[in-house]
Amino acid sequence: MEPSPLELPVDAVRRIAAELNCDPTDERVALRLDEEDKLSHFRNCFYIPKMRDLPSIDLSLVSEDDDAIYFLGNSLGLQPKMVRTYLEEELDKWAKMGAYGHDVGKRPWIVGDESIVSLMKDIVGAHEKEIALMNALTINLHLLLLSFFKPTPKRHKILLEAKAFPSDHYAIESQIQLHGLDVEKSMRMVKPREGEETLRMEDILEVIEEEGDSIAVILFSGLHFYTGQLFNIPAITKAGHAKGCFVGFDLAHAVGNVELRLHDWGVDFACWCSYKYLNSGAGGLAGAFVHEKHAHTVKPALVGWFGHDLSTRFNMDNKLQLIPGANGFRISNPPILLVCSLHASLEVFQQATMTALRRKSILLTGYLEYMLKHYHSKDNTENKGPIVNIITPSRAEERGCQLTLTFSIPKKSVFKELEKRGVVCDKREPDGIRVAPVPLYNSFHDVYKFIRLLTSILDSSERS
């Protein structure tokens, strides 16, 4: 029976349990969800780490040939199997023809980045000419802020969320200092209310309305790295524009995780990395977006050879013919080996589509949430053991695939025991463990096994 597009995860779980005449927490529910999953075959496009290869594993607790339970795609995505093939293609080309590789093959090196932009446009919801694939995320953020942050005595602030990812915080702080401004006065952070972990949308909009005339740039995460909160990008953009602000986003934890419509939402600029949900490998090629409305008005503050139009680039006359829009921000030759790894992943996304992946993700993370609450919620009167609290918003439209968990016992001991059993997740200060079932390669049975292991760990801690 095909689930309704509007069916809530909890309803889907209960529906299947009723069909199977079993409890919603039964393993058969997870197996049926996997049977109904039309995206399950994409798992075969990735290398899944084996238990025996994990550094913290206790082989007395697991079968060494089993797949790990990999819930860390929010930090580093798994390797697409085609990466090695694409890398070898370019290494062979280099070995066999040297510099001729710049101009021939399916990825001519001189336009290597441009050869895969078409695969990125639907993931971020942008036109090809609005996207540049280059550098690393924070470098791109600096380049964009140099062009969009033009403070005046009246409009000099950058607005961001409190406890933004440190690299964003440092970048904004240093940009403010670069202009000789006082960080205390020009760096405006929106904080959660007392006793709350996440930001309320009304509080963000209130700050924009009340202080917008003094804000030059609003720069938020699309999705917060710690709490997993997905911000309302179109609403923030609309509110910022109403007050005359430029609005940009760091999409590190949003790209490849949730559906984006950067062009339609009118976002001024954005940047992202590609090694998390986009599976391009550590330090993979990052991306930048500049809305086409700024193509001829907002120009890069720093330029290089690859911002010059290719048709006249080799005239060598030192007369800059700047490419309008995002591609004008490119400075240097694209790193073709990084292009290869990103290419391998983006092809999988093109086949799966973000719409289908997001639909599965809502159900997958919803199933995880249901199971956590069933066994370990403080609201479950039958739960006499340690409590698991989910600080990530419960509404699907306010989160991606990640849930951030806190515990009534020290997280360090929980994390260590999970590692021993082949669960790959991470801990983040002050007290969270981040768990991210990724729809491209994680299964509902992964979630079921994780819950079984976590329950066993918590039960053991209670007995000891």
From Swiss-Prot:
- Principal cellular location given in the protein's record: cytoplasm
Sorted UniProt keywords? Acetylation, Cytoplasm, Hydrolase, Pyridine nucleotide biosynthesis, Pyridoxal phosphate
Family annotation (InterPro entries): Kynureninase, PyrdxlP-dep_Trfase, PyrdxlP-dep_Trfase_major, PyrdxlP-dep_Trfase_small
Provide the GO MF annotations for this entry: kynureninase activity; protein homodimerization activity; pyridoxal phosphate binding
**Which pathway does UniProt place it in?**
Amino-acid degradation; L-kynurenine degradation; L-alanine and anthranilate from L-kynurenine: step 1/1; Cofactor biosynthesis; NAD(+) biosynthesis; quinolinate from L-kynurenine: step 2/3
GO CC aspect terms: cytosol; mitochondrion; nucleoplasm
PTM annotation (N-acetylmethionine): residues: 1
Cofactor(s), names only, from the UniProt record = pyridoxal 5'-phosphate
Task: Tell me which residues bear N6-(pyridoxal phosphate)lysine.
Answer: 276
Enzyme class of the recorded protein, top EC level = hydrolase
The record lists pyridoxal 5'-phosphate as bound by 137-138, 165-168, 221, 250, 253, 275, 305, 333
Its Enzyme Commission number(s) read 3.7.1.3
Catalyzed reaction equations:
L-kynurenine + H2O = anthranilate + L-alanine + H(+); 3-hydroxy-L-kynurenine + H2O = 3-hydroxyanthranilate + L-alanine + H(+)
Q: State the compartments where it is located.
A: Cytoplasm, Cytosol
**Disrupted gene: resulting phenotype?**
No visible phenotype. Mice were born at the expected Mendelian ratio and are normal. They however show very high levels of L-3-hydroxykynurenine compared to wild-type mice.
Among the GO biological process terms of this entry, one is:
L-kynurenine catabolic process
- Sorted alphabetically, which Gene3D superfamilies does this protein's record hold? Aspartate Aminotransferase, domain 1 (3.90.1150.10), Type I PLP-dependent aspartate aminotransferase-like (Major domain) (3.40.640.10)
Source species, domain of life: Eukaryota
Family in the record: Belongs to the kynureninase family.
- What is its biological role? Catalyzes the cleavage of L-kynurenine (L-Kyn) and L-3-hydroxykynurenine (L-3OHKyn) into anthranilic acid (AA) and 3-hydroxyanthranilic acid (3-OHAA), respectively. Has a preference for the L-3-hydroxy form. Also has cysteine-conjugate-beta-lyase activity.
What subunit structure does UniProt give? Homodimer.
Q: Which protein are we looking at? A: Kynureninase
**Species for this entry:** Mus musculus (Mouse)
